[in-house]
């Protein structure tokens, strides 16, 4: 008897070619939204070795692709946002990255680096997966959309206390 597994629903824009030039807003969440890149109550940007590592890895991944750039990104305690732009000349179309390949490389390399931090006792252990299986993307279609998303990314740390996953600090001794 053959078991038929349910088809996984894609979060990506149906029929859209993610290898074409454009700007993309991506969000990647930690597995089970665990707070692995900084304490929940700490101000985002506080000295977290795991958050610094994720930022470094992302810069390195983007740096490997001349056709890709990222002016705005932020590492939050349980997720990551970036506004990625892909602009390449026609002749270079085959060798340039897709948003999906950038995200895959980031997840893979950041997981390897995070495991190194765990082994050195510098980061909290995680169960099987560092990142959720997929990621959310939004194709940016105009300048207004671009500016709104850039502002959202920049203000995300300041508004962390309003996030549904934020927890008030305990004042118990």
Describe the predicted segments one by one.
Residues 1-173:
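Short catalytic/metal-binding and nucleic-acid-binding patches
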